[in-house]
Design a protein with these regions (language model features):
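Cysteine-centric segments in proteins
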Residues: 7-89
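Ser/Thr/Pro/Gly-rich low-complexity, intrinsically disordered segments
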Residues: 1-5
Length: 89
């Protein structure tokens, strides 16, 4: 998926997505998204999905790492709340 400059967090530490997110899979959608109420209040009502994929990120120490990311997405709202779940080799 093509991306502009996008940022996420590891706790309170920011990271930058570098390049595209690959191997995108839907984990949950609609009522299956546990924090749906929070997402609707914070970003707007729409059909929210939780997704995961593999991407390269730039960490605050400027190192590039390949990681598994999780995030939420809704049509017309976009991607929100990126989280690094696993560092890959």
């Amino acid at each position: 998926l093509p991306l502009g400059p996008q940022w996420g967090t590891i706790g309170l530490v920011k990271f930058e997505l570098v390049g595209d997110i690959e191997q995108v899979e839907t984990i949950a959608s609609g009522r299956g998204v546990k924090i749906r109420t929070h997402l609707q209040k914070a970003y707007g009502k729409d059909r929210w999905r939780k997704l995961k994929g593999v991407a390269t990120v730039r960490l605050p120490n400027r190192k590039l790492r390949k990681v598994e990311l999780h995030w939420y997405e809704a049509h017309g709202i976009g991607r929100r709340d990126f989280k690094i779940k696993t560092y890959l080799v």
